[in-house]
């Protein structure tokens, strides 16, 4: 009987379940979108129950479509949108408020207060993160301060907190296991990456009771079992990593100095820095990559908030394309951007600027500008934001990148991949399996149960689909980068009164 590993890939806009073979091939994908909730400008929420319902539907549908039963699944791995925060009642399992999504900016003012109190360095040294509304800690505090009765219940030990992985594990195990892994814990502003523990000083500053926190486990170990009622058999939950760390693992960036960029809703570049903590001097994040039996691994990370989401905006906001793949043909209908630059700072700017008051800006528009120029500028903005991060990463790590491995939905766009190689000046490698986030979760789970024997075996399975070589003149590149930087300066601090 053929055996498989199941990956549960819980993303920002959809929940997916993907079944992988021993060769690392995709056997089946099931996917369901869920509701995006925007209560007011800058606020983004999800219904936590809907997240679990779509994910549990996905895993059942995945096995059904593949024509296999639970007895053929040796392990499940979880990967998730990071930082998104759920607080729920320990007794009933009911969320006390909607999940507050990583994109949500409601705690920006509180982050400013913490900076004004001189606490930025404390958080940076302990967590590797910057004080920004992006991370979970200030979101937990907001729920405790603003949901009636939540603070009192939390102080009595009646509420639990978790990122999405923790929420899924809690529900899949029917409330038996309250756990997260080091990669997810390292995104909360509550976890000390140097000690590998929750940090009492940080918990005190943010007013989060320790009793709310999940147990922190390795990214590759059996933490519990999916209850038999879901798939007809108890299946070990053996892998867990935040989406970007999982993608780094799935792209086999297992040696220090290797880097990948994931092109999804946002854009996320991670460089494996091995077992050393590299503090960034260029406004990148230092984060946990993963913790496996071979040790604790760290990464430098640059986060772009809006990448693929800018294409959704062209479709839903401006109506200039009917579906996302159309953007490539539209952008190819003009030879260049016609001097138009789009800075998609719809939710502020992430690394390396960390400007929560920046807003979306389009510059260089003339009477001759068309929707094709705007489409091209939108695609180019994804690659140019990535360039800003790579420059900082190379300075921090003291390593010149040899190539960038790319994954995520937007890597199917050949124009974007070629432009990315051109502006970076290094080759961009697209793997055969671009579902590397789910693959990473599957690898971590499979390793824990012996389905795969070693990381060397995983490295050998990585296969190249296409390598994009840079072929832009230095003069053209310099002009593009110079104008892009001017456009970014105009977007900064726009919403600051």
Swiss-Prot record:
Residues annotated as binding ATP = 12-14, 265, 308, 312, 409
Q: List this protein's GO terms for biological process.
A: glycerol catabolic process; glycerol metabolic process; glycerol-3-phosphate metabolic process
Q: Where does glycerol bind?
A: 82-83, 134, 243-244
User: Under which EC number(s) is this enzyme classified?
Assistant: 2.7.1.30
Which PROSITE patterns does UniProt cross-reference here? FGGY_KINASES_1 (PS00933), FGGY_KINASES_2 (PS00445)
Positions contributing to ADP binding: 12, 16, 265, 308, 409, 413
**Cited InterPro entries:** ATPase_NBD, Carb_kinase_FGGY, Carb_kinase_FGGY_CS, FGGY_C, FGGY_N, Glycerol_kin
Sites binding sn-glycerol 3-phosphate sit at: 12, 82-83, 134, 243
Question: Taxonomically, which superkingdom?
Answer: Bacteria
Spell out the Pfam families in the cross-references: FGGY_C (PF02782), FGGY_N (PF00370)
Pathway given in the UniProt record: Polyol metabolism; glycerol degradation via glycerol kinase pathway; sn-glycerol 3-phosphate from glycerol: step 1/1
Entry's HAMAP family?
Glycerol_kin (MF_00186)
Question: Which protein, by its recorded name, is this?
Answer: Glycerol kinase
Recorded source organism is: Nitratidesulfovibrio vulgaris (strain DSM 19637 / Miyazaki F) (Desulfovibrio vulgaris)
């Amino acid at each position: 009987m053929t055996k498989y590993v199941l990956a549960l890939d819980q993303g920002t806009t959809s929940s997916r379940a993907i079944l992988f073979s021993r060769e690392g091939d995709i056997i089946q994908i099931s996917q369901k979108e869920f509701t995006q909730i925007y209560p007011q400008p800058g606020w983004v929420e999800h219904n936590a129950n809907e997240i679990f319902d779509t994910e549990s539907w996905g895993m059942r549908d995945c096995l059904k479509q593949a024509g296999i039963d639970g007895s053929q699944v040796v392990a499940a791995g979880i990967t998730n949108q990071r930082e998104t925060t759920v607080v729920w009642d320990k007794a009933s399992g009911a969320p006390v408020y909607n999940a507050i999504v990583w994109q949500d900016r409601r705690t920006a003012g509180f982050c400013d207060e913490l900076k004004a109190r001189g606490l930025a360095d404390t958080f940076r040294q302990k967590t590797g993160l910057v004080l920004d509304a992006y991370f979970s800690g200030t979101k937990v505090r907001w729920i405790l301060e603003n949901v009636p009765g939540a603070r009192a219940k939390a102080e009595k030990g009646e509420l639990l907190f978790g990122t999405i992985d923790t929420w899924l594990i809690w529900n899949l195990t029917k409330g038996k296991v309250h756990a997260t892994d080091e990669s997810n814990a390292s995104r909360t502003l509550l976890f000390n990456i140097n000690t590998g523990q929750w940090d009492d000083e940080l918990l005190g500053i943010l007013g989060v009771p320790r009793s709310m926190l999940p147990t922190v486990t390795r990214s590759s170990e059996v933490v519990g079992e999916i209850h038999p009622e879901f798939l007809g058999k108890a299946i070990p939950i053996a892998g867990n990593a935040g989406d970007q760390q999982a993608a780094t693992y799935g792209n086999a960036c297992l040696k220090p100095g290797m880097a990948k960029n994931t092109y999804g809703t946002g854009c996320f570049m991670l460089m494996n820095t091995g077992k050393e903590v590299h503090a960034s001097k260029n406004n990148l994040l230092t984060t946990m990559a993963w913790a496996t039996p071979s040790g604790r691994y760290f990464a430098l990370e640059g986060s772009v908030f809006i990448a693929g989401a800018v294409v959704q905006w062209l479709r839903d906001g401006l109506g200039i394309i009917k579906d996302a793949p159309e953007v490539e043909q539209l952008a190819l209908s003009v030879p260049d951007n016609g001097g138009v630059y789009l800075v998609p700072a719809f939710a502020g700017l992430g690394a390396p600027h960390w400007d929560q008051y920046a807003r979306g800006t389009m510059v260089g528009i003339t009477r001759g500008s068309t929707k094709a120029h705007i489409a091209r500028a939108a695609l180019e903005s994804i690659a140019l934001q990535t360039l800003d991060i790579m420059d900082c990463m190379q300075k921090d790590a003291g390593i010149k990148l040899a190539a960038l491995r790319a994954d995520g939905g937007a890597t199917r766009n050949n124009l974007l991949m070629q432009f990315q190689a051109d502006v970076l000046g290094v080759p961009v490698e697209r793997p055969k399996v671009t579902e590397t986030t789910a693959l990473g979760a599957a690898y971590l789970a499979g390793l824990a149960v012996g389905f795969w024997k070693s990381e060397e075996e995983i490295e050998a399975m990585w296969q190249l689909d296409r390598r994009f070589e840079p072929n832009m003149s230095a003069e053209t590149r310099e002009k593009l980068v110079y104008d892009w930087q001017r456009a970014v300066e105009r977007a900064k601090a726009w919403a600051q009164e």
